């Protein structure tokens, strides 16, 4: 949290998989998230692990920690005399838990550009590119290890980590800022906290 706040971001966007376990098990571990600070707010979209960890029970915890969870919805933020749309979608495992799956069209309907979409799984970019300016995703852990890139790409729409483009839309797939307990190792794929600087067209 200290490293993130030291960057002095205007807004903080979290692309899912924030927890592994129920609030009863992880509330103490999650407590430092309340220290995140950004003038425009802290926003998140759910990843698959939020659903495995009882997302309905986590929603009030996220709110209490100052994190706005966007589930097929958007926030239109005033920025320097203009607007910025920040949207988030649910994950495609939601249906297994009787919850709505990702619906980027609903999330973005009626919102102004520029639009940033948080979608935990990057393959949604194939569908969303015409409607957005930037998509931020995770899920792949950056491939975990360099030699796993091809396999990770196969199961994630061809995306592994870094920048991708389709026409005027851009996708960034982040490797995440920590480790996953199921494979607590990184080989040549360091974790990161990404600082993006958005510039208006001249």
Model regions: which residues?
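Soluble catalytic domains of enzymes that build or remodel membrane lipids, polysaccharides, and related
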Residues: 1-202
